[in-house]
Design a protein with these regions (language model features):
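Hydrophobic ligand-binding cavity/cleft-lining segments
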Residues: 1-41, 146
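Beta-strand/loop substructures that line and gate deep hydrophobic ligand-binding cavities in soluble
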Residues: 80-132
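Glycine-rich portal/gate segments that line the openings of hydrophobic small-molecule binding cavities
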Residues: 38-86, 98, 102, 132-146
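Well-ordered beta-strand positions in beta-sheet-rich domains
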Residues: 5-7, 63-65, 89-91, 106
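A short, compositionally biased micro-patch
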Residues: 11, 30, 71-72, 97
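Generic helix-packing signal
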Residues: 21, 72, 92, 111, ...
């Protein structure tokens, strides 16, 4: 299992930050590993939203179908994608902070079945991928110094 957690303090209100993060089509704006996002069901972020997220893979691109499993605006979002290779569990929480908010992105990537033997390599690679995504998230949310 590989896990990456980042927290960003922003001037955006909880409602603004949550709306931006819940619409997974925005992932391509801040995560350099995301090549494209297509909404399959719903309209923007919402409890019934489903997105196909295409990521740069090793040797070829991989499209993951993210389904919204928890949607509690403007505080909590859980989206999950399952493939034959791995399962991705992404939780986004937004907390009020003065006139702005604090956004926490918690990504958990798990190899499936016999592929779990590659967890150590996945952890190392996921840390680098997460660092690049976190930098992009700070940029788009207009991160403030804590």
């Amino acid at each position: 299992m590989a896990r990456y957690v980042t927290t960003v303090r922003t001037a955006k209100t909880p409602k603004e930050a949550f709306a931006y993060m819940a619409d997974l089509r925005n992932f391509a704006e801040w995560d350099p590993g995301v090549k494209a996002v297509r909404q399959v069901e719903g309209s923007g972020g919402g409890p019934d939203s489903v997105f196909d997220v295409t990521v740069a893979g090793i040797g070829r691109d991989l499209t993951l179908r993210y389904e919204t499993e928890e949607y509690d605006a403007p505080r909590n979002l859980l989206v999950v994608a399952r493939s034959t290779v791995f399962t991705s569990i992404d939780r986004i929480t937004v907390e009020p902070d003065g006139t702005g908010s604090v956004v926490t992105y918690d990504a958990d990537l798990r190899l499936n079945g016999v592929l779990r033997v590659g967890d150590l390599g996945l952890r190392l690679m996921f840390g680098q991928i997460g660092d690049r995504a976190a930098a992009g998230l700070r940029r788009v949310l207009g991160a403030q110094v804590a």
